[in-house]
Regions:
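Residue-level signature of mid-helix packing/kink "hotspots" within the transmembrane helices
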Residues: 55-63, 153-154, 158
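C-terminal ends and interior cores of transmembrane alpha-helices
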Residues: 83-98
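Cytoplasmic helix-loop-helix junction between adjacent transmembrane helices
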Residues: 107-149
Length: 202
């Protein structure tokens, strides 16, 4: 069935799968961090501080992400985003004694960069895959991708709470890191190379 699909549809499905998997784990991670560190006795201000770098570095990445995608290719920015999210999750697998506010803030900074790289790459890639002049199709494809964001975030929040209850913080983070690493490897193998890259003139 996969082989019968057009290359554009295959790329669209791959990009959408990347985006959905990332959004789910991103939402779950945020809920895990809030609940876990609240359980450890962190004050509301300390918990809020954990996400400061997430937002700041996300804004910075949003400003330079388009330029970076044009320079190195959207496939690379998407794969870098996935890899950085795996790294951010791995940072939270250290012993509990090392999970200081500063350490978790650094992990969240990586996650914030990863989020905006992934989001920018997904949206821009979809626009390139739709044939020129097919504005209605472009609207539907982008709407299907981005319209699912809030719903997936909500599912991710719920998933984070459930995972924390069922298997605990460390195992939940490990499970998400492994799942996202599998998605990352598939993306490395299957995502079109030089997607969105501005080619240098000879």
């Amino acid at each position: 069935m996969w082989a019968r699909l057009s290359p554009e549809i295959r790329q669209y499905l791959l990009i959408t799968s990347n985006y959905w998997a990332f959004t789910l784990t991103d939402g779950a991670l945020r809920m895990l961090v809030v609940l876990h560190f609240h359980q450890l006795g962190y004050s509301p201000l300390q918990v809020a501080m954990l996400f400061l770098f997430y937002e700041v570095f996300g804004v910075i990445t949003n400003l330079v992400g388009g330029w970076l995608g044009a320079r190195i290719g959207l496939n690379k920015t998407m794969n870098i985003g996935l890899a950085m999210q795996v790294a951010a999750l791995a940072m939270l697998l250290v012993p509990a004694s090392m999970l200081t506010v500063v350490w978790v803030m650094a992990a969240q900074a990586l996650s914030g960069i990863a989020k905006d790289l992934n989001k920018m790459s997904a949206k821009s890639s979809i626009k390139l895959l739709v044939p020129e002049g097919a504005d209605a199709a472009l609207y539907r494809w982008v709407a299907a991708l981005t319209g699912s964001k809030n719903a997936l975030k909500g599912v991710g929040f719920f998933m984070g709470g459930v995972l924390l209850t069922w298997i605990g913080f460390r195992n939940a983070v490990l499970a998400m890191a492994v799942a996202l690493a599998v998605i990352w490897v598939m993306s490395l193998l299957l995502l079109k190379r030089d997607l969105g890259k501005i080619m240098s003139p000879n």
